[in-house]
């Protein structure tokens, strides 16, 4: 876990989560409709349209990916301050190894979610495969 969130205010936490969300939007390849954020009359950040639960999950997984990358970068800076042998003895080395494995799993799951998202559409409340749009009979 990230102890930083225990040390910062709720406003700072919300700002950081907003940054993670904004960074995750470009990772979302080919959404069915544009995903954008605007500020409403109350000064709150809101999406310009309603997102499906699937789109929310994809953005959330993108936020996790960005957060893990941030953690890995922080540990990498620590590694650069120590010599190779000294770093291997620290718990940071073990933590980096675990984060690397977690990042691989998160990226795989994120790609799977995007793949499923791109292969269907919802019509009249039912999921419909778009496979026919990808594979067309040659005439």
What are these regions (language model features)?
Residues 15-93, 107:
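Divalent metal-cofactor coordination and adjacent catalytic microenvironments
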């Amino acid at each position: 876990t990230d102890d930083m969130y225990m040390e910062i205010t709720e406003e700072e936490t919300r700002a950081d989560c907003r940054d993670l969300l904004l960074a995750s939007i470009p990772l979302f390849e080919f959404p069915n409709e544009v995903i954008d954020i605007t500020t409403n009359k109350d000064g709150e950040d809101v999406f310009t349209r309603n997102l499906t639960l699937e789109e929310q999950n994809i953005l959330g997984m993108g936020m996790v990916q960005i957060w893990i990358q941030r953690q890995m970068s922080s540990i990498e800076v620590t590694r650069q301050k120590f010599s190779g042998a000294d770093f291997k003895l620290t718990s940071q080395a073990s933590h980096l190894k675990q984060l690397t494995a977690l990042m691989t799993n998160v990226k795989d799951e994120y790609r799977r979610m995007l793949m499923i998202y791109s292969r269907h559409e919802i019509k009249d409340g039912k999921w419909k495969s778009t496979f026919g749009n990808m594979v067309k009979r040659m005439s």
